[in-house]
């Protein structure tokens, strides 16, 4: 266990070996915050208990990376308003797929880096169909997010059939980098991106949507594409 009862600020924090964190006054982390990364190598870690101990966090200066295998709720991050680097969700194979939504990120307005989902690459038959995100249906919880530095979804395995829409991103106006979705899995449910109707700009050189076999309507991207100057590509979609 790690007790930091009076600490209000940290340079950076990489948590791989603690089961419980108590930091009730910690509001600011100027560098990276990694939670549960490489948890498979540290069997005793409880990523949810670590999140519970960070309930006062409002600011992460660089990357925030969360291994979601043991996460059941993001509610402890309800005060987080700014991430300066990437916000990375490492999605692993899991039979404990109790995570239902992104509730807890309602205060987050800006991600300076990319918003990233990723499963990594697996050998055939080596990973469970169920993942820590198998019950996620949309982006509900990110309802006040207005600006991100980039967007990347890279899915190589797992059941994401319940994830059907981008609902929750209605206030997203600006993506300062690339927008890429690359799906190499048949259990992918995304069919509705109407929440991106208000997206005004994508400033990166790549705008790509691949593997969304249920997605047929791209008109919600009309406003963003009007001003887009890079390469827009879609293939293996609906």
Residues covered by each model-derived region:
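Concave beta-strand-loop units of leucine-rich repeat
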Residues: 1-25, 30-53, 59-137, 141-216, ...
């Amino acid at each position: 266990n790690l007790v930091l009862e009076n600490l209000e600020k940290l340079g950076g924090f990489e948590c791989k070996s603690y089961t419980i964190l108590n930091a009730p006054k910690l509001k600011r982390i100027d560098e990276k915050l990694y939670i549960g990364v490489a948890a498979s190598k540290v069997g005793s870690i409880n990523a949810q208990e670590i999140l519970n101990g960070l309930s006062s966090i409002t600011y992460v200066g660089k990357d925030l990376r969360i291994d979601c295998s043991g996460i059941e709720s993001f509610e402890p991050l309800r005060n987080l308003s700014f991430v300066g680097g990437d916000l990375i969700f490492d999605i692993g194979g899991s039979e404990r797929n109790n995570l239902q939504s992104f509730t807890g990120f309602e205060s987050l307005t800006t991600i300076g880096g990319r918003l990233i989902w990723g499963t990594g690459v697996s050998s055939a038959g080596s990973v469970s169909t169920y993942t820590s995100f198998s019950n996620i249906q949309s982006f509900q919880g990110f309802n006040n997010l207005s600006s991100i530095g980039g967007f990347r979804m890279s899915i190589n395995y797992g059941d994401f059939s319940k994830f059907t829409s981008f609902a929750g991103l209605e206030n997203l106006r600006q993506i300062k980098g690339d927008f890429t979705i690359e799906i190499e899995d048949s259990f992918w449910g995304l069919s509705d991106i109407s929440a991106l109707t208000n997206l005004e700009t994508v400033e990166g050189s790549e705008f790509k949507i691949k593997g969304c076999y249920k997605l047929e309507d791209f008109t919600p991207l009309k406003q963003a594409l009007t001003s887009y100057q890079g390469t827009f590509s879609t293939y293996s979609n609906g």
